[in-house]
Amino acid sequence: MTQAPRSTRRQLGQFGLALIAAASMILVNPAAQAQSKKDSAVIGMILEPTSLDPTTAPAAAIGEVVHYNILEGLTKINPDGSVTPLLAESWTMDADGKAFTFKLRKGVKFQDGSAFDSAAVKFSFERAKAEKSTNKAKGAVFSNIAHISTPDAHTVVLVLTNPDGNFLFRMGENTAVILHPNSADAAATKPIGTGPYKLDNWAKGTAVTLTKWDGYRDAANVKLKKVTFRFINDASAQVAALLAGDIDGMPRFQSPQSLKQFQTDKRFVVELGSTAGKGIMTINNKKKPFDDVRVRRALSHAIDKKAFIDGVFEGLAKPIGSHMAPTDAGYVDLTGQYAFDPEKAKALLKEAGVQTPLNVTLTLPPPPYARKGGEILAAQLAKVGIVAKIENVEWAQWLGGTFKGNFDLTVINHVEPLDYMAYANPNYYWGYDSKAFRDLAAKHSATTGAK
């Protein structure tokens, strides 16, 4: 993937906070379980999904439960970012990068016995690009599909309006999973896919349980018969659940101050690594006075990222200067773009004609990084004359309000890789609307290597 034009990268830096938290996972030591030969696992999750259909709702927690487990797409994104076949066994691309011909796997069934074929693929993508679609990738991916043809039951041809060098990658995201026409409408609560697991039970507020599907094409290599995702938002409750043996692992562990306790306990394995997640303080670009770029820059200069990282993550995070993670291809370090400079922040506010104190609302979802981090941010903003009233909301409230533009500032972790192209969508929740950026983004997509 080629690097984005420099002007593109600069415009991606216009938010108050941008950092990468270390990905921490705590697992029960496999050696300690060797004698039990467990065929089930209980995994802790920070947030409960609001739906189980990733094609209609934006929450990343949905994909964490269903993607590659229940629902699958044409391609698979591997941990190293490479793309390999999944429901498509192969594909070809024409010379101008606009037409993709996918050959589909034969003999694949949905969990209700329905056949997986080209008609299901066509239905899924037409549904994603429909006028009333709420698929979060509609603007970035599916609206760019000009035509879908199905020469036979195992061939799909997708013709794009404009070349997209990341198209095969996008086909591996959870927004592009394939649903059957007969079961798609119920996918929010009863998803039926082609993956190795099927939904057993969703005890709302507590857990989602999946069981092995014996009809899966590679069922012999699926070792776990049951997987339960248990929802534990509170950091201290995560610690207690691990110590009590109530869960077998906790991805994105929310109590960094407790890591040493687990690192010295031979019952556990602690994994620390990189992540594609970007923790940001999102600014509503459509609301005054945030529609003035000088105000947005002032917010950026008001934030001491090091103090935030130390206070929330015990130092286990890295500052970034744009909506690109170091794990993204083409990453450029822009951490110096908006350095911590309270006096410059005050000057920019004055230049923009903003009277201080400026009263704003800081809407915070449940994760500890947002709640604890929000308090730190509010204290920092106060020092430049911005009074942030904290509003703590539940996850469903956050999604319902924020994605309708009902917020001033918020704190959230964007976990999808290469999602900086969301800034080319003026209807996305942060309301960033720049024709210059959209033109650059289109040029970037058209010139990026597609293989």
Please name every model-derived segment.
Residues 36, 103, 137-180:
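Surface-exposed binding/hinge segments that line
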Residues 44-95, 126, 192-194:
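N-terminal lobe/hinge region of extracytoplasmic solute-binding protein
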Residues 82, 164, 169-222, 226, ...:
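Gly/Pro-rich hinge or "lid" segments in bacterial periplasmic/extracellular proteins
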Residues 89-134, 151, 157, 241, ...:
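Aromatic- and charge-enriched surface segment that lines or borders ligand/interaction sites
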Residues 185, 215-260, 378, 387-389:
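Ligand-site clamp/hinge motif
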Residues 286-328, 372-373:
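Periplasmic-binding protein-like
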Residues 314, 318-351, 367-372:
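Structural transition elements
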Residues 387-398, 421-451:
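Extracytoplasmic/peripheral linker and loop segments enriched in polar/acidic and small residues
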